[in-house]
């Protein structure tokens, strides 16, 4: 199974998702989207595959900032903003053959991977997930 994580190493949730995958025996393809940026096609594919709307895909501050564009359903302007400001996309997104999930909370990752780490599994902040 091919597993891809759209990863922000500055985010504890993203680091936890990556650790969870590797502890599960999965070596994911890591996409450092802050460095590489987003493409129009990537954003549309994530939105479609995750069944999320723009408000759910955005960090809270970006969602507030882009609210007029979201209400106007101005997808082109929203995507252009996200291409210019990749940090505005919520994280982490994980993609497998079973689907795409915004892994907030981290437990959303479980239904799209074939195995999980041994229990107990703790986040870097000490919260038990399994």
Residue positions per predicted region:
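Local sequence-structure signature of Cys/Sec-based thiol-disulfide redox active-site neighborhoods
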Residues: 1-24, 28-33
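Thiol/selenol-based redox catalytic cores and closely related redox-interacting motifs
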Residues: 33-130
């Amino acid at each position: 199974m091919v597993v891809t994580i759209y990863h922000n190493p500055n985010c504890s949730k993203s680091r936890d998702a990556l650790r969870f995958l590797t502890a599960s025996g999965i070596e994911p393809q890591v996409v450092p989207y802050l460095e590489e940026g987003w493409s129009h096609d990537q954003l549309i594919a994530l939105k479609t595959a995750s069944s999320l709307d723009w408000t759910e895909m955005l960090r809270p501050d970006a969602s507030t900032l882009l609210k007029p564009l979201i209400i106007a359903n101005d997808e082109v302007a929203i995507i252009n903003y996200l291409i210019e400001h990749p940090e505005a996309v919520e994280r982490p997104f994980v993609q497998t053959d079973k689907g795409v999930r915004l892994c907030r909370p981290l437990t959303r990752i479980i239904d799209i991977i074939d195995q999980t780490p041994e229990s107990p599994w703790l986040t870097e902040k000490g919260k038990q997930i399994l």
